[in-house]
A protein has these predicted regions:
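Conserved acidic residues
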Residues: 71, 120, 208
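Short acidic-hydrophobic, aromatic-tinged amphipathic segments that line or gate anion-handling sites
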Residues: 94-108
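Short amphipathic alpha-helix with an adjacent loop that forms part of the alpha/beta core around
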Residues: 106-119
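Beta-strand-loop-alpha-helix segment that lines the small-molecule cofactor/substrate pocket
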Residues: 121, 127-188
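A contiguous active-site-proximal alpha/beta segment in oxidoreductase catalytic domains
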Residues: 160-224, 233, 243
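Rossmann-like dinucleotide-binding domain that binds NAD(P)(H)
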Residues: 224-316
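NAD(P)-dinucleotide binding in Rossmann-like oxidoreductases
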Residues: 284-290, 300-369, 373
């Protein structure tokens, strides 16, 4: 592998951090023709939750302004969809939702769609159990390619809870079809992350090691499926893949044969938790989630990586860090979900420079760039 290939890691070039504008400082949306969007899923990821800052509808409303027209909201729970729509219609974004139609399935919408309702983008926020495979009822992406050729897709992570080989096949089919597709790993869009990436490119550095730590505050997590491995596949899939993706963004592709992992299980003494917000006794013992997972691996270029995910904190705030090591450099990203802070130690000095990005919103930056809406 060339030094350039090693340096780029994920092969994605950096974005100038100065171009990542906070939502409250962005220019007013430019006038233009309607931008039709379909929302799939009427849950927390699409319409917000006290648990965290995710809320895709909010970001697209502010990015597109009066151009946004949500032509369809797809969710089998029509009562939940209706409640979400009513809140929007009672607010300042009425124009985006006043003509929104509700459907239980994407098939229902495709059958009734008029030419005027054809979407330019589809936002997928449904649970991963129902997508990412080629099995009937769990083959959403394949149906989207069939019904909406060429339409841009935004798919929330995780992309699948099925076999990873099948998920890779689905990804190849999306690429072959030519649909622009973005996945909701928004931490790549942090100004701090792009500053790290820019330094690596400008100094022509090669990553030696990455070390990721993701410790969640579990007390506020009250969705039963989250605690059930048979439903949401556990916290590494639900949360830890954010840092797996970020690690790959710097280190590049992983030698899968080198991955080793250990975990603290629910029935081991260190795995006792005192403030679980669901009745775990209703979950089969074999489906209860691990409390701590650690993994190590080698990247294909020879660098090494580690990940620790823990379900251990009370309160609301998570404790998350990513460290990247290079010749002469240590870069430490701290608290990426709240006030992203970057600590940099450079060659020839023991001092750590500190950069805080209190006004950053990677969700908005992602929404702005994934469909080239600038």
């Amino acid at each position: 592998m060339s030094r350039l290939g090693s340096r780029r890691g994920s092969r994605r070039a950096s974005i100038d951090p100065l171009r990542l504008i906070p939502m409250d400082k962005a220019k007013a949306p430019a006038a233009g023709e309607d931008f039709n969007v379909v929302f799939i899923g009427a849950g927390n990821i699409m319409f917000g939750s006290p648990e965290g800052p995710w809320n895709h509808s909010f970001r697209f409303e502010h990015k597109l302004g009066p151009r946004l027209k949500v032509v369809a909201l797809i969710d089998p729970a029509l009562d939940r969809a209706a409640a979400a729509l009513q809140k929007k219609r009672d607010s300042f974004v009425l124009s985006a939702y006043q003509d929104t139609k509700m459907y239980k399935t994407i098939d229902d919408f495709a059958r009734s769609m008029t030419p005027e309702e054809k979407p330019r983008a589809i936002i997928v926020g449904s649970p991963p159990h129902w997508r990412g495979t080629d099995l009937p009822g769990r083959d959403l992406e394949l149906k989207l390619l069939q019904y909406f050729p060429g339409v841009a897709l935004f798919v929330e992570k995780p992309v699948s809870t099925g076999p990873y080989t099948t998920a890779l096949d689905i990804a190849k089919k999306i690429e072959a079809a030519g649909n622009l597709c973005s996945v909701g790993y928004m931490l790549r869009y942090l100004k701090a992350v792009q500053m790290m990436k820019q330094i690596i490119e400008d100094k022509e550095l090669v990553v030696m090691a990455t070390s990721a730590r993701y410790v969640c505050a579990y007390e506020a997590i009250t969705k039963p499926d989250w605690w059930d491995k048979s439903r949401d596949q556990g916290p590494v899939i639900e949360q830890g893949t954010h840092f797996c993706d970020l690690s790959r963004y710097f280190g590049g592709d992983v030698d899968i044969s080198s991955v080793m992992a250990h975990s603290v299980e629910w029935d081991e003494e260190p795995g006792h938790l005192s403030k679980i917000g669901v009745d775990e006794s209703k979950i089969a013992p074999e489906n209860r989630i691990p409390r701590v997972t650690t993994a190590t691996w080698k990247y294909e270029n020879g660098a090494v990586g580690t990940l620790t995910h823990a379900v251990s904190l009370h309160g609301k705030n998570y404790s998350c860090e990513l460290e990247v090591y290079l010749d002469g450099y240590q870069m430490r990203l701290v608290d990426p979900y709240h006030i992203p802070t970057l600590y940099i130690r450079r060659p020839g000095d023991d001092y750590e420079e500190t950069y805080r990005f209190g006004d950053d919103d990677p969700f908005f930056s992602e929404a702005s760039r994934c469909f080239q809406l600038d």
